[in-house]
Curated annotation (Swiss-Prot):
Organism the protein comes from: Corynebacterium diphtheriae (strain ATCC 700971 / NCTC 13129 / Biotype gravis)
Entry superkingdom: Bacteria
Protein name: Large ribosomal subunit protein bL34
Gene transcribed to yield this protein: rpmH
Family annotation (InterPro entries): Ribosomal_bL34, Ribosomal_bL34_CS
GO biological process: translation
GO molecular function, one term: structural constituent of ribosome
Amino acid sequence: MAKGKRTFQPNNRRRARKHGFRIRMRTRAGRAIVAARRNKGRKSLTA
């Protein structure tokens, strides 16, 4: 049986554009995510 390809193909630009800080701050929900991570004391808030 043939297996599929690896699904994680790392790309720093795509990572930042999809999950980065500036993207998170654009929407109310994104700001809520950052706030929740701040309250929890996360060392890293976003990608």
